[in-house]
Amino acid sequence: MKIAFTELSWHDYLWFQQNDKKLLKRINLLIKAIARDPFDGIGKPEPLKANLSGYWSRRINSEHRLVYTIADRDLLIISCRFHYQR
């Protein structure tokens, strides 16, 4: 499975690299879990609705969510910081 980041999600990921190594480890763990099974596993995966229909979310912690989509067996990470404001 190919893993790609949007420009915004890459900036989020880099922010965690510089500011919160513990949550960075959690994000990496979630990415590995998504690669194994995109719709089941840790982080309470849930399909998003309304304008985010087609995207999925997993909990990083109570403040942050990993938002992603799967296309042709490839993972595209939309955001990994905060909830769904963007």
Swiss-Prot record:
SUPFAM superfamilies membership: RelE-like
Q: What class of enzyme is it?
A: hydrolase
Q: Name one GO molecular function term.
A: RNA binding
InterPro entries in alphabetical order? RelE/ParE_toxin_dom_sf (IPR035093), YoeB_toxin (IPR009614)
Q: Which Pfam families match?
A: YoeB_toxin
State its Enzyme Commission number(s).
Answer: 3.1.-.-
State the UniProt keywords alphabetically: Endonuclease, Hydrolase, Nuclease, RNA-binding, Toxin-antitoxin system
Active-site residues per Swiss-Prot or TrEMBL entry: E46 (proton acceptor), H83 (proton donor)
Does the entry feature the keyword Isomerase, yes or no? no
- Look up the record and give one Gene Ontology term from the biological process aspect: RNA catabolic process
The subunit structure is: Forms a complex with YefM which inhibits its toxin activity.
Q: What does this protein do?
A: Toxic component of a type II toxin-antitoxin (TA) system. Has RNase activity and preferentially cleaves at the 3'-end of purine ribonucleotides.
Family, as annotated = Belongs to the YoeB family.
Know the name of this protein?
A: Toxin YoeB
In the UniProt record, what gene is named as encoding this protein? yoeB
